[in-house]
Amino acid sequence: MAHHDPINLMTPPAGLAQLNERSREIFRQIVESYLATGEPVGSRNISRLIAVPLSPASVRNVMADLEQLGLIYAPHTSAGRLPTEAGLRFFVDALMQVGDMTEAERQSIQSQLASVGRAQSVEAALDEALTRLSGLTRAAAVVLTAKSNTRLKHIEFVRLEPERALVVLVGEDGQVENRVLALPPGVPSSALTEASNFLNARIRGRTLAEARLELETALAHDRAELDQLTQKVIAAGVASWSGGDSDDRQLIVRGHANLLEDLHALEDLERVRRLFDDLETKRGVVDLLGRAENADGVRIFIGSENKLFSLSGSSTIVSPYSDATGRIVGVLGVIGPTRLNYARVIPTVDYAARLVSRLLGG
């Protein structure tokens, strides 16, 4: 099941381990009330909710201790209390019972992905997974994936200058990618044509990663058949596919509208507007999701742990997924308010990532 180490938790408040059962129960009720309503909760309501009968005065004493520990705080407009980010992190890591998905929820994702199958592109499968994920979690669903997951259809070399050519890669999904290539001196047009023919005979239906492996083997075996300049063009072309910058990754977002539900104040609206901007421009979001690529299971970033200003009032729950070779090729998950239903969202993200891995043969 999901693995969620604390991510850069502000130093855990001293004395956390010493919280007795009564304090934990009161704290749990404060968090669960917040997750359900978004509103501060007072001692009178807590005393009605907890299993052990306690007077509001006794509850207030415990709440004062929890506040001292940095787990809850009093918003200036209310006599009630809300959990702090450190409190939410403590709840998620130490107190929360991770739920399980219903069979209907599992089927919802599974049947949608099965209908896509291998007949369509990886992007189509991810798109379906995200649509289901955002629907089930009522949050925005995101995926960070390598563009190289696209299966190739065709490659062409177009000469720009005597020593520069454009490599045009066309994917089966219609995606076109252009890269400029430096050519060795004296390359004739015939070498570009020969290189195109050699590559097209071997790359169709393969991802960039698969094509690279295939071509390294093919070049070793078929070197004698190829003109030396053609070999250099092919080697340079293959090298141009292996860039590791963020342009080689794409961010797909579905369910933006879910972020507009249940906003409590104007500042909430302003925060969501900034988040929309960041999701649109990818600023920082790619880096954030990239931090989860080497995780073993689900990673959770709460509030300011996100390191991205617009996400400071949000939570991000993500999990890596892998391809047929077991190599991690992307991250998927959800972005939503800090009062996400963590117990429900964590297994849903975990399940979606496993299904996508299975679809890719991982």
UniProtKB/Swiss-Prot annotation:
Pfam families reported in the protein's UniProt record: HrcA
A GO term, aspect molecular function: DNA binding
UniProt keyword NAD, yes or no: no
Superkingdom of this protein's organism: Bacteria
Keyword Repressor: yes
Key words of the record: Repressor, Stress response, Transcription, Transcription regulation
GO biological process: negative regulation of DNA-templated transcription
Entries under InterPro entries matching the protein: GAF-like_dom_sf, HrcA, HrcA_C, WH-like_DNA-bd_sf, WH_DNA-bd_sf, WHTH_transcript_rep_HrcA_IDD
Function: Negative regulator of class I heat shock genes (grpE-dnaK-dnaJ and groELS operons). Prevents heat-shock induction of these operons.
Homology family: Belongs to the HrcA family.
Protein name: Heat-inducible transcription repressor HrcA
Organism this protein belongs to: Bradyrhizobium sp. (strain BTAi1 / ATCC BAA-1182)
